Amino acid sequence: GFSYSSDAIFPTDAEVFNRVISEDKRSTSAIISVSQIISQVSSFQIALGLTEQSGFLSDPYKLKDIRPDNRTQIALTNSYRHFFINANAAWHVNYRYYHDDFGISSHTFDMRWYQNLRQSIQLVPSVRFYSQSAASFFTNIDNFVKPADEYQSSDHRLSAFGAFSGGLSFVANLGSWTATLTAERYVSNDSYSAYKVSQPSTALVRYNRISVGLDYTF
C-alpha cells in the first residue's frame, strides 16, 4: 500500500500569540504485508510500514515547541487470528514495534476476544498495553533560554510512558446496519514505561470513555 498527504497549517490567533502565520507539512507512507493461513481456523500476518514526514512538524499552539523538520518512522506489526469452534469465538492478538529518528521506540500489545452470542450479536472484551521511550529532545519544562534553533518539546506524547486500557464492546448486526456500544478505561503513567524515564511528564492522562457507533453497508 502507498499513501501521500500534504497539509497547509494556519494556526488561529497567530499574530496575537506570536505563532507561525502559515506552514505546510507532507507525509509519504508505504506498507508491505504477508499473510499465511496456518490451518482452517488460524492465520498469521506480518506487515512492515515506513513513513517519511517533512515540513513543519512542531506544535504551533505550544509556547516553546521546536522539532526537526524531517521524521522517518518504521513499524513492524504481527497479527494472529484463531477461531475456537466449540466456543464459537475468535481470538485476535497483535504486537507492534515502532521506531523513529526522533529517538522514540515503542511496543504495543493488544488482545481481543470476539464472542458470538447469537448469529447477529457479538461481545468483544479487549486489553491493550503500550510502552514508549522519550524523544531525544523531550523536556518536561519549557526552556526559554535555549536558542530558537535548538530542538525541544514538552508534549507529553513525546515523553517516556506506558499505558494500559481495557474495554468491552457490544456489537449487533442488523442487516445492512451494524450498531456498536463500547466502554473503555485508559490509564497512562511514566512508571508503566519499559524504558528509562529521565524526565517524567506531568500531562499524562487517564479517562473513561463510552461510545456509540452506527455503520451502514451497501
Which role fits each region the language model picked out?
Residues 2-65:
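Solenoidal tandem-repeat scaffolds enriched in leucines and small polar residues
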Residues 16-17, 83, 87, 144:
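Membrane-targeting and insertion segments and their boundary/processing signals
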Residues 37-41, 85-87, 118-120, 174-177:
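Outer-membrane beta-barrel channels and translocator barrels
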Residues 89-93:
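Short, surface-exposed connector motifs at secondary-structure boundaries
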